[in-house]
Amino acid sequence: MASSFNSLAPQIDLPQTEHQILSFWETQDIFQKSVAAREGKPTWTFYEGPPTANGKPGTHHIEARVFKDVFPRYQTMKGLQVIRKAGWDCHGLPVEIAVEKELGFSGKGDIENYGIAPFNEKCKASVQEHVGEFTNMTRRMGFWVDFDEAYWTMSGEYVESVWWSLKEIWNKGLLVQDYRVAPYCPRCGTGLSDHELSQGYESVVDPSVYVKFPATSGKAGELG
């Protein structure tokens, strides 16, 4: 019986086969066709929880992307139209600290002397560079996601949408003003999220220091 699948050589070159499949997917627009073919079907929407583009991708990013790819593929196989939007987290201390290290800065004062506007531009350029590396890694591992319509947290449109959402919540009386103990970084001169605080955790060994002071009054003072 004839098979529609190509036979594999006994000594298969897996990386070469992967590249052939990836090339076929890209040249034939297989991902886009898988979405278009289910037009009118019930939708299952996936917005990627964006990675922070402050450095080169690591193995933990691959692990997370496996889960982000498996579930949309499963829903696609069930016949749903799966919209998959990529995203890039461009803000936060990780990006700023990476640029500070690149420029040899040691604190907030160096940024102010350098200039807020040019520092922001350096941060944007750094994000753009690392996004390219993330994109290459994502395509190499076969993760299907729409990069053409990706959202960027540093875009004016995205920032305005966040302010709009906050205003809507305020108008509905859902914002509460209260006190909260928040971590603060004296070097960076800014508050920290719980996630950012946990990134700086390390085990250290410090001496225990005991200081004795003479008692000058009370029963302890009477004892000399």
Features from the language model and the residues they span:
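N-terminal, positively charged nucleic-acid-binding surface of large information/translation enzymes
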Residues: 2-224
